[in-house]
Design a protein with these regions (language model features):
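Flexible, gly/pro- and Lys/Arg-enriched active-site loops
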Residues: 91
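Short, conserved active-site loop motifs that form the nucleotide-linked donor/cofactor pocket
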Residues: 102
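Short S/T/G/P-rich N-terminal loop/turn motif that feeds into the first structured element of a domain
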Residues: 3-65, 73-83, 106-110
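Non-catalytic beta-sheet/beta-sandwich ligand-binding modules that flank or precede catalytic cores
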Residues: 99
Length: 110
């Protein structure tokens, strides 16, 4: 909204979607399986322009276990990504089963 107020057309800006997950089962096996499921979207979800999955190495009290970063063409692509059949049926289903909690941010890349 602020960008559109100052004259930047947000519909033309790329979007970065970042989600951090705390998992119920923090075993290396579960974290690796979850990373594989997230990365399996590459090539299957057409809106994705870039994807990264990272595993936490500090393991502090405030740490999340795994992070997902996705780059998309625009806000419409983000909406399409959120509703993509593979994302909904495979990824969301797995993540809802294994996550304890999650936080997300979506922002424009200028």
């Amino acid at each position: 909204i602020i960008l559109s107020i100052i004259g930047i057309k947000t519909e033309a800006l790329m979007v970065r979607h970042i989600v951090l997950f705390k998992l119920k089962d923090k075993s290396e096996e579960n974290i690796n399986k979850t990373a594989e499921v997230l990365l399996s979207m590459k090539g299957k979800v057409p809106q994705i322009r870039g994807i990264e999955v990272g595993r936490d190495f500090l393991h502090s009290e405030r740490s999340y276990d795994i992070g997902l970063t996705v780059t998309l063409d625009d806000a419409k692509a983000l909406d399409d990504y959120q509703n993509d059949p593979y994302h909904c049926e495979v990824v969301k289903k797995h993540m809802h089963a294994v996550r304890e909690s999650s936080v997300a941010i979506d922002y424009y890349i200028d």
